[in-house]
């Protein structure tokens, strides 16, 4: 409920060191006067008066800018306090909402002023006083924590963050500062422990130390990432130049409060010097990161970039010219978040803020390489606050659900939704008030038996499509799923099956409706009854738990055999498995029919005998033996037969021998004739 960023305390070092210059000079060229003489050894001259901020001014301005962003984005939700430390700790504001505003903090900081350089160097001036006061301030409850305590909350979370802006000599001094802070934190938790209960116990504290040095001065303090000092304390150290402390705090605040940066580009603004012309400007704004993460869509990515001088990414969104559009053109909003500009004093930011506060809205679109436009966000103001609205790019929850017919398998417009609802009602299990003594196997039996066969679509079943046309079929199906079928129910079902057989013998068509008949595309009477019998047998097999069910199944199988559509009884387990996985309207398996002649039957039987005699031989063994039997009928290569093992046979041993007698074409030597005769 209370996160670590709920409480943030700035501890500002107000010692003599912070009165020195930051060494970043600002040229005041608008002041009239003689140019300053060119400094020796430099190739440039500075026109006008030059000013430089002190370390104290840089620290105060950047910390106040930090709290401005927090209060703009989380008004009344996140709290920031300031403590100034010199010879003692000076409390600037409290957790009270009346002091959590910019005017109170600014007026108090003006009264503190810059540290005097005439202050004598003394050990009494230390930032440790402020760190002690910061730990005590973390133990004080906020209004939200007090309300939770009054509401009866037993465990109130209390976490916080302390940002200390100081300057240390080396790593040893910084380590000593961390140890003192950790010791004081443990002592404070011991003071508020029961039974005293003087405040809240600090569950965890995040200490951020910013070591400030003037521009161009190297520090002996090294940067260090987040490190766990104790179970109650994590600390990190950053060494930055005084002019860059504002950018550093801007980078830190994005991680502290999970913020994101958005740069609105191509904002048309008129020039101050020439009102007839306009130029495009960019404005960077901050908001919660969820404003980007809630925008979803297929293959949707934001264009990000890193601005010069910063270490974080910013999302680039393009200004969309305001235009009048109806409600049909607006996308639904999936979230709204407060917005604040990064540079609140710049002219482009001021123009954008005034434009929005005057009641105008701005649409922001994602730039695409393909040239298409995708509007993802909208800026608008209400009640003096500016919000960014995340627009739904994908389908909204308020839109109609996508048609189930547009699936990857094609159009399926006839899902059996009412029948599925009835099946769910039949399969519903209600918990018992008292625990049964025996095993509760009835629910498990129902779970295994009911949903095994359920055609999802109307065009995948014949049996269930005929329930409205055949008056006896609903009652017949009800008797099939009964667990306690008696002899009378069996006789009724037998009668209905025989009546169905008589209808098939007369050649009566099954009473399909026009729509079902068009979908099923089964026009032959024999095909209709064959599919009907197959599905009926499949349903009876799943419910054959009593002798009456088994008798009914045998009767139907004999009827199918008489009709010429007998099932294969040689492998009952395979047939039982196919009853779960196949629909009666699936493509039929190749089965021998009565029209097959005796010769083809004998061939099949002979092939079966040959295959059965193979035993456990694999397909590779069968193919290898067939190749060996074929190769044994031919003589092998003479070179392989005459050459000893391990040697290579020469293909043409007499090639190139000049002494060999040259045979005349068309004349056969007598020796060859004799060999041919003897052979």
Curated annotation (Swiss-Prot):
Stretches assigned to coiled coil: 519-541
Motif (Nuclear localization signal (NLS)): 604-610
Database matches in Pfam families: Mat89Bb (PF10221)
Any one cellular-component term (Gene Ontology): perinuclear region of cytoplasm
GO biological-process terms attached to the record: cell division; centrosome localization; dorsal appendage formation; flagellated sperm motility; meiotic cell cycle; oocyte nucleus localization involved in oocyte dorsal/ventral axis specification; posterior mRNA localization involved in anterior/posterior axis specification; regulation of fertilization
Broad class of the protein's primary localization: nucleus
Keyword field: Cell cycle, Cell division, Coiled coil, Cytoplasm, Developmental protein, Differentiation, Meiosis, Mitosis, Nucleus, Phosphoprotein, Spermatogenesis
Modification after translation: Phosphorylated.
Origin superkingdom: Eukaryota
Region Disordered, annotated ranges: 564-610
Location(s), subcellular: Nucleus; Cytoplasm; Cytoplasm, Perinuclear region
Function as written in the Swiss-Prot or TrEMBL entry: Component of the integrator complex, a multiprotein complex that terminates RNA polymerase II (Pol II) transcription in the promoter-proximal region of genes. The integrator complex provides a quality checkpoint during transcription elongation by driving premature transcription termination of transcripts that are unfavorably configured for transcriptional elongation: the complex terminates transcription by (1) catalyzing dephosphorylation of the C-terminal domain (CTD) of Pol II subunit Polr2A/Rbp1 and Spt5, and (2) degrading the exiting nascent RNA transcript via endonuclease activity.
Quaternary structure and partners: Belongs to the multiprotein complex Integrator, at least composed of IntS1, IntS2, IntS3, IntS4, omd/IntS5, IntS6, defl/IntS7, IntS8, IntS9, IntS10, IntS11, IntS12, asun/IntS13, IntS14 and IntS15. The core complex associates with protein phosphatase 2A subunits mts/PP2A and Pp2A-29B, to form the Integrator-PP2A (INTAC) complex.
PANTHER family: INTEGRATOR COMPLEX SUBUNIT 13, SARCOMA ANTIGEN NY-SAR-95-RELATED
Similarity comment text for this entry: Belongs to the Integrator subunit 13 family.
Official protein name in the record: Protein asunder
Organism: Drosophila mojavensis (Fruit fly)
